[in-house]
Protein backbone atom coordinates (compact mmCIF):
# COMPACT_ATOMS: atom_id res chain seq x y z
CA UNK A 1 0.00 0.00 0.00
CA UNK A 2 1.02 3.60 -0.61
CA UNK A 3 0.21 6.19 2.04
CA UNK A 4 0.69 9.95 1.83
CA UNK A 5 -0.07 13.26 3.48
CA UNK A 6 -1.47 16.00 1.28
CA UNK A 7 -2.35 19.67 1.65
CA UNK A 8 -0.73 22.96 2.56
CA UNK A 9 2.12 23.16 5.07
CA UNK A 10 0.87 22.47 8.55
CA UNK A 11 -2.57 21.46 7.27
CA UNK A 12 -1.80 18.08 5.73
CA UNK A 13 -4.41 15.33 5.70
CA UNK A 14 -3.76 11.57 5.60
CA UNK A 15 -4.24 9.84 2.27
CA UNK A 16 -3.86 6.55 0.46
CA UNK A 17 -3.13 5.93 -3.21
CA UNK A 18 -5.80 3.88 -4.99
CA UNK A 19 -5.44 1.38 -7.83
CA UNK A 20 -5.63 4.20 -10.39
CA UNK A 21 -2.87 6.21 -8.74
CA UNK A 22 -5.29 8.76 -7.27
CA UNK A 23 -5.27 10.09 -3.71
CA UNK A 24 -8.11 9.01 -1.44
CA UNK A 25 -8.81 11.00 1.72
CA UNK A 26 -8.18 8.93 4.87
CA UNK A 27 -9.11 11.65 7.35
CA UNK A 28 -12.45 9.96 8.06
CA UNK A 29 -10.56 6.84 9.15
CA UNK A 30 -7.54 8.28 10.97
CA UNK A 31 -6.90 11.89 12.05
CA UNK A 32 -3.22 11.78 11.05
CA UNK A 33 -0.86 9.38 9.32
CA UNK A 34 1.35 8.23 12.17
CA UNK A 35 2.89 4.80 12.59
CA UNK A 36 0.32 4.08 15.29
CA UNK A 37 -2.49 4.87 12.84
CA UNK A 38 -1.21 2.61 10.07
CA UNK A 39 -3.07 -0.49 11.25
CA UNK A 40 -6.42 1.29 11.03
CA UNK A 41 -5.45 2.94 7.75
CA UNK A 42 -4.56 -0.42 6.22
CA UNK A 43 -8.04 -1.70 7.05
CA UNK A 44 -9.84 1.05 5.15
CA UNK A 45 -12.08 0.28 2.17
CA UNK A 46 -10.07 2.34 -0.30
CA UNK A 47 -12.69 2.43 -3.05
CA UNK A 48 -15.24 3.97 -0.67
CA UNK A 49 -12.99 6.80 0.48
CA UNK A 50 -13.45 10.35 -0.92
CA UNK A 51 -11.43 11.01 -4.05
CA UNK A 52 -9.08 14.00 -3.78
CA UNK A 53 -9.48 16.26 -6.79
CA UNK A 54 -6.68 18.04 -8.60
CA UNK A 55 -2.99 17.78 -7.76
CA UNK A 56 -2.53 18.80 -4.14
CA UNK A 57 0.83 19.36 -2.51
CA UNK A 58 2.44 16.30 -0.94
CA UNK A 59 3.93 16.63 2.53
CA UNK A 60 6.29 14.27 4.32
CA UNK A 61 4.26 11.03 4.13
CA UNK A 62 4.37 10.13 7.82
CA UNK A 63 3.75 12.38 10.81
CA UNK A 64 5.80 12.16 13.98
CA UNK A 65 9.29 11.32 12.75
CA UNK A 66 11.33 11.26 15.95
CA UNK A 67 14.84 11.35 14.52
CA UNK A 68 16.69 11.03 11.24
CA UNK A 69 19.63 8.63 11.31
CA UNK A 70 21.75 8.80 8.18
CA UNK A 71 24.39 6.46 6.80
CA UNK A 72 27.32 7.91 4.87
CA UNK A 73 29.48 6.37 2.16
CA UNK A 74 27.35 3.23 1.82
CA UNK A 75 28.04 2.74 -1.89
CA UNK A 76 31.64 1.87 -2.76
CA UNK A 77 31.79 4.04 -5.88
CA UNK A 78 30.48 7.03 -3.94
CA UNK A 79 33.19 6.64 -1.31
CA UNK A 80 35.80 6.55 -4.07
CA UNK A 81 34.44 9.67 -5.81
CA UNK A 82 34.43 11.45 -2.43
CA UNK A 83 38.13 10.60 -1.95
CA UNK A 84 37.32 8.86 1.31
CA UNK A 85 38.20 5.34 2.47
CA UNK A 86 35.61 2.61 2.00
CA UNK A 87 34.01 2.07 5.43
CA UNK A 88 34.60 -1.18 7.27
CA UNK A 89 31.45 -0.56 9.30
CA UNK A 90 28.52 1.83 8.77
CA UNK A 91 29.25 5.53 9.15
CA UNK A 92 26.43 7.21 11.07
CA UNK A 93 25.40 10.84 11.39
CA UNK A 94 22.17 12.71 12.13
CA UNK A 95 20.05 15.14 10.16
CA UNK A 96 17.98 17.74 11.99
CA UNK A 97 14.22 17.27 12.11
CA UNK A 98 13.94 20.88 10.93
CA UNK A 99 15.46 19.74 7.61
CA UNK A 100 12.31 17.74 6.76
CA UNK A 101 10.62 18.95 3.60
CA UNK A 102 7.86 17.90 1.24
CA UNK A 103 8.99 15.96 -1.84
CA UNK A 104 8.25 18.77 -4.30
CA UNK A 105 8.84 21.80 -2.09
CA UNK A 106 11.64 24.23 -2.79
CA UNK A 107 15.09 23.61 -1.37
CA UNK A 108 16.47 26.81 0.16
CA UNK A 109 20.25 27.11 0.18
CA UNK A 110 21.77 28.30 3.46
CA UNK A 111 23.22 31.78 3.69
CA UNK A 112 26.42 32.20 1.64
CA UNK A 113 26.16 28.65 0.27
CA UNK A 114 28.72 27.73 -2.39
CA UNK A 115 28.75 23.92 -2.28
CA UNK A 116 25.14 22.69 -2.34
CA UNK A 117 24.84 19.07 -3.48
CA UNK A 118 22.32 16.29 -4.03
CA UNK A 119 21.98 12.65 -2.93
CA UNK A 120 19.14 10.31 -3.91
CA UNK A 121 18.62 7.79 -1.09
CA UNK A 122 16.39 4.96 0.07
CA UNK A 123 14.69 5.88 3.34
CA UNK A 124 13.47 3.33 5.87
CA UNK A 125 10.68 4.21 8.31
CA UNK A 126 10.79 2.14 11.48
CA UNK A 127 7.56 0.47 12.62
CA UNK A 128 8.58 -1.16 15.91
CA UNK A 129 11.09 -0.34 18.61
CA UNK A 130 14.55 -1.63 17.70
CA UNK A 131 17.14 -2.21 20.40
CA UNK A 132 19.90 -4.76 19.71
CA UNK A 133 17.87 -6.20 16.84
CA UNK A 134 19.39 -9.09 14.90
CA UNK A 135 19.85 -8.89 11.14
CA UNK A 136 17.41 -11.77 10.72
CA UNK A 137 14.56 -9.90 12.41
CA UNK A 138 15.47 -6.37 11.29
CA UNK A 139 13.26 -6.15 8.20
CA UNK A 140 10.22 -7.22 10.23
CA UNK A 141 10.58 -3.93 12.12
CA UNK A 142 10.10 -1.79 8.97
CA UNK A 143 6.83 0.13 8.52
CA UNK A 144 7.66 1.23 5.00
CA UNK A 145 10.10 2.76 2.57
CA UNK A 146 10.38 6.31 1.24
CA UNK A 147 12.32 8.29 -1.33
CA UNK A 148 14.70 10.86 0.19
CA UNK A 149 16.98 13.58 -1.16
CA UNK A 150 19.82 13.99 1.34
CA UNK A 151 20.68 17.53 0.28
CA UNK A 152 24.09 18.66 1.54
CA UNK A 153 26.27 21.76 1.80
CA UNK A 154 29.73 20.29 1.31
CA UNK A 155 31.74 23.24 2.61
CA UNK A 156 29.85 23.23 5.89
CA UNK A 157 29.98 19.43 5.96
CA UNK A 158 33.70 18.94 5.42
CA UNK A 159 35.69 22.14 5.56
CA UNK A 160 34.59 23.53 8.92
CA UNK A 161 35.37 20.68 11.26
CA UNK A 162 34.31 17.06 11.23
CA UNK A 163 30.62 17.28 12.14
CA UNK A 164 28.75 16.28 9.00
CA UNK A 165 25.46 17.37 10.55
CA UNK A 166 26.47 21.01 10.01
CA UNK A 167 26.26 20.51 6.27
CA UNK A 168 23.36 18.07 6.28
CA UNK A 169 20.83 19.60 8.66
CA UNK A 170 19.93 22.92 7.02
CA UNK A 171 16.24 23.81 6.71
CA UNK A 172 14.56 22.09 3.70
CA UNK A 173 17.53 19.71 3.21
CA UNK A 174 15.56 16.47 3.68
CA UNK A 175 12.73 16.14 1.14
CA UNK A 176 10.81 12.91 1.85
CA UNK A 177 8.08 11.16 -0.15
CA UNK A 178 5.73 11.36 -1.95
CA UNK A 179 4.58 8.07 -0.43
CA UNK A 180 5.25 5.72 2.44
CA UNK A 181 5.20 2.34 0.68
CA UNK A 182 4.62 -0.79 2.75
CA UNK A 183 7.21 -3.59 2.64
CA UNK A 184 4.87 -6.05 0.93
CA UNK A 185 4.57 -3.72 -2.05
CA UNK A 186 8.28 -2.95 -2.24
CA UNK A 187 9.53 -6.53 -1.96
CA UNK A 188 13.31 -6.79 -1.84
CA UNK A 189 14.73 -3.42 -0.72
CA UNK A 190 18.10 -4.47 -2.15
CA UNK A 191 16.96 -4.39 -5.77
CA UNK A 192 15.56 -0.93 -6.45
CA UNK A 193 16.72 1.28 -9.32
CA UNK A 194 17.37 4.90 -8.43
CA UNK A 195 18.23 8.08 -10.32
CA UNK A 196 18.63 11.84 -9.99
CA UNK A 197 18.69 14.58 -12.63
CA UNK A 198 19.71 18.23 -12.30
CA UNK A 199 18.27 20.60 -14.91
CA UNK A 200 17.32 17.61 -17.05
CA UNK A 201 20.80 16.04 -17.03
CA UNK A 202 21.24 12.63 -15.45
CA UNK A 203 23.65 12.89 -12.54
CA UNK A 204 23.05 9.72 -10.54
CA UNK A 205 22.07 6.23 -11.65
CA UNK A 206 22.24 3.30 -9.28
CA UNK A 207 20.57 0.36 -7.60
CA UNK A 208 20.27 -0.48 -3.93
CA UNK A 209 21.86 -3.87 -4.61
CA UNK A 210 25.27 -2.13 -4.61
CA UNK A 211 25.03 -0.95 -1.00
CA UNK A 212 28.04 -1.92 1.10
CA UNK A 213 25.77 -2.63 4.09
CA UNK A 214 22.21 -3.70 3.34
CA UNK A 215 19.07 -2.45 5.07
CA UNK A 216 18.90 -5.35 7.54
CA UNK A 217 22.55 -4.89 8.49
CA UNK A 218 22.05 -1.15 8.97
CA UNK A 219 19.01 -1.50 11.23
CA UNK A 220 20.80 -4.09 13.34
CA UNK A 221 23.98 -2.00 13.55
CA UNK A 222 22.27 1.28 14.41
CA UNK A 223 20.13 -0.42 17.07
CA UNK A 224 23.29 -1.39 18.96
CA UNK A 225 24.01 2.29 19.61
CA UNK A 226 20.74 4.20 19.19
CA UNK A 227 17.30 2.87 20.05
CA UNK A 228 15.05 3.22 17.02
CA UNK A 229 11.41 4.00 17.76
CA UNK A 230 8.29 3.77 15.57
CA UNK A 231 8.36 6.65 13.12
CA UNK A 232 12.12 7.13 13.11
CA UNK A 233 13.64 7.57 9.65
CA UNK A 234 16.91 5.98 8.54
CA UNK A 235 18.44 7.02 5.23
CA UNK A 236 20.83 4.55 3.72
CA UNK A 237 23.41 6.28 1.53
CA UNK A 238 23.69 7.38 -2.08
CA UNK A 239 25.16 5.92 -5.28
CA UNK A 240 27.87 7.75 -7.26
CA UNK A 241 27.17 10.90 -9.22
CA UNK A 242 27.06 13.64 -6.60
CA UNK A 243 28.12 17.11 -7.64
CA UNK A 244 31.36 17.25 -5.67
CA UNK A 245 32.56 14.10 -7.44
CA UNK A 246 32.07 15.36 -11.00
CA UNK A 247 35.14 15.46 -13.25
CA UNK A 248 37.00 17.47 -14.39
CA UNK A 249 35.26 19.99 -12.15
CA UNK A 250 32.75 19.71 -9.33
CA UNK A 251 29.19 20.94 -9.94
CA UNK A 252 27.27 22.62 -7.14
CA UNK A 253 23.68 23.75 -6.77
CA UNK A 254 22.66 27.34 -7.41
CA UNK A 255 19.38 29.21 -7.24
CA UNK A 256 17.09 28.23 -10.11
CA UNK A 257 18.41 24.68 -10.47
CA UNK A 258 15.84 21.87 -10.55
CA UNK A 259 16.45 18.44 -9.04
CA UNK A 260 14.31 15.50 -10.19
CA UNK A 261 14.80 12.10 -8.59
CA UNK A 262 13.15 8.75 -8.15
CA UNK A 263 13.43 5.24 -6.77
CA UNK A 264 11.64 2.28 -8.31
CA UNK A 265 8.25 1.66 -6.59
CA UNK A 266 8.67 4.72 -4.35
CA UNK A 267 7.71 7.53 -6.73
CA UNK A 268 9.50 10.70 -7.79
CA UNK A 269 10.39 14.13 -6.42
CA UNK A 270 11.02 17.53 -7.98
CA UNK A 271 12.61 20.47 -6.15
CA UNK A 272 13.58 23.90 -7.36
CA UNK A 273 16.56 25.43 -5.59
CA UNK A 274 16.20 28.91 -4.11
CA UNK A 275 18.71 31.33 -2.67
CA UNK A 276 18.76 31.91 1.07
CA UNK A 277 15.99 33.85 2.72
CA UNK A 278 14.78 34.06 6.30
CA UNK A 279 12.25 31.24 6.66
CA UNK A 280 10.82 32.47 9.94
CA UNK A 281 8.42 30.05 11.57
CA UNK A 282 7.42 28.15 8.43
CA UNK A 283 6.31 24.59 9.15
CA UNK A 284 8.37 21.95 7.39
CA UNK A 285 7.29 18.43 6.50
UniProtKB/Swiss-Prot annotation:
Functional pathway: Carbohydrate degradation; L-rhamnose degradation
Keyword Magnesium assigned: yes
Outcome following mutation: residue 121 to A: Loss of hydrolase activity
Residues reported to bind pyruvate: 73, 168, 238
Protein name, entry field: 2,4-didehydro-3-deoxy-L-rhamnonate hydrolase
Enzyme class: hydrolase
Xref: PANTHER family: FUMARYLACETOACETATE HYDROLASE DOMAIN-CONTAINING PROTEIN 2A, FUMARYLACETOACETATE HYDROLASE DOMAIN-CONTAINING PROTEIN 2A-RELATED
Cofactor descriptive note: Binds 1 Mg(2+) ion per subunit.
Subunit structure: Homodimer.
Catalytic activity from the UniProt record: 2,4-didehydro-3-deoxy-L-rhamnonate + H2O = (S)-lactate + pyruvate + H(+)
MF (Gene Ontology): hydrolase activity; metal ion binding
Spans through the membrane: none
Stated consequence of mutating residue 78 to A: Loss of hydrolase activity
One Pfam family, short name: FAA_hydrolase
Domain of life: Bacteria
Family: Belongs to the FAH family.
Amino acid sequence: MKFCRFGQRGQEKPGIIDADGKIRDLSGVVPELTIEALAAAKGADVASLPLVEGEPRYGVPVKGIGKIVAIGLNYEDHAIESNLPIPTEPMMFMKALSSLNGPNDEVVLPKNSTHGDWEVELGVVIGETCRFVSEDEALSKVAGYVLVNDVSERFNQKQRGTQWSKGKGHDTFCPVGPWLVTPDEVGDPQDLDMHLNVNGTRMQTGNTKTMIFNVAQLISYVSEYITLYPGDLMITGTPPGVGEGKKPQAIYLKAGDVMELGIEKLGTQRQQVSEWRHLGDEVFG
